[in-house]
Amino acid sequence: MSINGNAAASKLYISDVTLRDGSHAIRHQYSVPQVRQIALALDEARVDSIEVAHGDGLQGSSFNYGFGAHTDVEWIEAVADVVKHAKIATLLLPGIGTVHDLQAAYNAGARIVRVATHCTEADVSRQHIELARKLDMDTVGFLMMSHMSSPQALAEQAKLMESYGATCCYVVDSGGAMNMNDVRDRVLALREVLQPETAIGIHAHHNLSLGVANSIVAVEAGAIRVDASLAGMGAGAGNAPLEVFIAAAERMGWQHGTDLYRLMDAADDIVRPLQDRPVRVDRETLALGYAGVYSSFLRHAEAAGHKYGLKTVDILVELGKRRMVGGQEDMIVDVALDLAQQTTT
């Protein structure tokens, strides 16, 4: 098997997101001991990086997105205390987190930052990417909801991030809405316009049960960094399950550098028991992928459905029709109120 025409000797970069995207699955309530335990297990399994933050990135703890059990800095410091191999990553959404928050995360131990914008708004990432480069951080551009942009338009946005200083750009399937052709086309489009030394990453969600398949196709098209989480812990139906992707990569003959059995143990013994709502494809999470809705809307939509006596699926489908994107969580209640009014008239 080859990776984008190169020998399979190309080692994949395994980026774990259990302690960031996975935070959505438990409404950002990781305790410090839990964070340490998960980080230690991941480090012992030799993943390349461990992303740590509120589910919505630095300073995501808020009324709009949900308050975290701890601050981002507390979580990052907890991971820094135990990891010996993996680099600590964090996520920053311009407009939620600031350059000051990025500096604080760096001081706490983060050495990688993924600067995340909606797939058409890369221009708002400039000052954050430039600061990250000044701090000598591994600087990544993260284009959320990539399914809402054509491959060529997405590539243009990635090129902007590269021009600001990003050394890696991600195709991000925030809604778990893409199929394998969608992913392949976008990765190939990025590879065509980015400099050869600029890496490409894939961040998949499992809402259509395609998280692992999409990650494999992305690697075949030229992606080298792969996001995944233990037991798929993440928003919606979760991310590509890390232990499943690694098993598949092993079968493909790809080098990944991790310990599959340690990952399997960590997924089942440590992470899965934390889920107060099973992270799986079900009626509600399938609706996310089918309607192309931001995966972290799930728990908010469930709460609104319960409050206003509505089906969560109806709320999610309407959000998809209105093309709501990450950062518009406040509109979930507006949509619920509109639907509730329609049922009474």
UniProtKB/Swiss-Prot annotation:
GO terms for biological process: catabolic process; L-leucine biosynthetic process. InterPro entries: 2-IPM_HCS-like, 4OH_2_O-val_aldolase, Aldolase_TIM, DmpG_comm, DRE_TIM_HOA, PYR_CT. It catalyses: (S)-4-hydroxy-2-oxopentanoate = acetaldehyde + pyruvate. Its EC number is 4.1.3.39. Keywords: Aromatic hydrocarbons catabolism, Lyase, Manganese, Metal-binding. Mn(2+) binds at residues 21, 203, 205. It is an enzyme of class 4 (lyase). Substrate binds at residues 20-21, 174, 203, 294. Residues 12-264 form the Pyruvate carboxyltransferase domain. The keyword Manganese applies. The active site is at residue 24. One of its GO terms (molecular function) is 2-isopropylmalate synthase activity. The keyword Manganese applies. This is 4-hydroxy-2-oxovalerate aldolase 2. The gene is amnG.
